[in-house]
Each structure stands twice: as structure tokens, then as C-alpha cells.
Amino acid sequence: MKFKLKDKFVFLTVGIVLILCSWLLNPTLSPTAPTAGATYEYKSIHSPDGIGKFYQGREIAQVMGHTGASWLERPSREAEEQPSKIRNVLNLKPNDVVADIGAGTGYLSFRIAPLIPKGKVFAVDIQPEMLDIIKSLKKEKNISNVEPILATESNPNLPPESVDLAIMVDAYHEFEYPFEVMQGIIKALKPGGRVVLVEYRAENPFVMIKALHKMSQKQVKKEMQAVGLTWRETKNLLPQQHLMVFEKPQT
């Protein structure tokens, strides 16, 4: 009888160990893994620049925290990236509403705002510290039509059908829940509204940016198609980045 009890205990222990090992080897089986509409993969062995979470075959990059705010405002940014060219090709109307998703310090938000004097810019970020910087700069620059919006990792928190154009500059590749965020953006867009993504060119090995912080046109199109957006054009006017334009269907 003692041997049988011991035998049962061994089998039970082995079973528990096997279940735990299966969770470690395939975290998507873990009960704590998100079960959203998107298919995410999780890998314990991954790039040190990523979070171990994969979407559409791409590892999601780590977020640049608010401690890197000075890099966003660096004096050399205009010469290196020529962001002034971005706002000049957006074809904005004076009363348009623009959502700057992953706005950071509001670098682009404050440059777009004067182009839409009768509209507004939603400066959206998940970090309260970044929004504090935006609020401070808004007062300093005396710009009234920039509205800071605190988002979550999965929701941009924008009013439905309120946005004419949503723009993401070197931000999308860091979204922890890209599918859910894009769903939120699409809900916020007016019919026919546009999405503009600016990302460093993954196709070019001479763009000296970490691999997970670059995206190819093919990958961007794949991910935008997955949420129902239509590609309209890619503008090759920036020295290191793609500028890709997508559109929400009219109906």
C-alpha cells in the first residue's frame, strides 16, 4: 500500500512538472496570456531590445521611456530626420483634427498645430510624464489647440469618428497591443480618414537604428491590412524613414 501511494505521488508530481514546463516553453498557453482578437506569440528567448511578444511575425520593441525625452527634442533632429517635411505633405485643412499617437514631448504636435488654427491636435501618449512635458510646452509656446490625451497600452482613448488624420512617428513599432490600438484609432477616424506611419527603413542596413526600431514597407502594409486599412501611397521624401499613408474605408 505504501508503494502504491508513493507511486501515485510520483505520477502526480511528474504531471505538474510537465504542465509547468509546457507553459514555460509556450507562454501562449498560460492562463495569464491576453486573449484578444489579435494573435500574439510569446517567446522566452528574444532580442534584448524587444519584449518577447510577437505580432504578425514581428517582435515588439521596448518603449523609450520619458527619461529619453531630451533625445526627442535634440537640436540635430531636423538635420537628421527632416520632420518639417512631414507636416508639409499631410495636406491638412484649417479645421482638421489630428491625433498624434505616441506624441512623446509633442515635438510634432506643436509643429502641426499652426496648420490647423480652427482644428486641434490630440497629443496622445501612455506616459503621464510625457503629457506633463506637453502641458508645460503648451503654456510656454502659447498654443491652445493641442490637447493632451492619456492613453492606455491598448486604447488611445479618442472620441469616436472625431479624427481626420492619425499620425505615428517612430512609435507604432513599440505598441504593446498594436491590433487593439489600431482598432481604437480606426473607431476614432472619420469615414475616409487617414493614417500616416513614419518608420525607419528596415530594408536599408545603412540606417543605423536598432533592428526592432525599424519596419519594412511590407510589414507595415501587412499589419495595417490586418485591421482593415487601405494603403494609398508611400512618400520617399525623408532621408531615413518611410512615410506611408493609409485610409479608412468610407463605409
Summary of predicted features, one role per range:
Residues 34-93, 97:
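Class I SAM-dependent transferase core
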Residues 99, 103-155:
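Class I SAM-dependent methyltransferase SAM/SAH-binding core
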Residues 116-117, 175-176, 189-191:
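Helix-to-beta-strand junctions that scaffold the AdoMet/dcAdoMet cofactor pocket
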Residues 156-165:
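A short acidic, Gly/Pro-enriched loop at the edge of an enzyme's catalytic core
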Residues 164-178:
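A short SAM/SAH-binding and catalytic strip from SAM-dependent methyltransferases
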Residues 179-194:
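A short glycine-rich, Lys/Arg-flanked "PGG" loop and its adjoining helix->strand segment in the class I
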Residues 196-221:
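Conserved class I S-adenosyl-L-methionine
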Residues 231-251:
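Core SAM-dependent methyltransferase catalytic element
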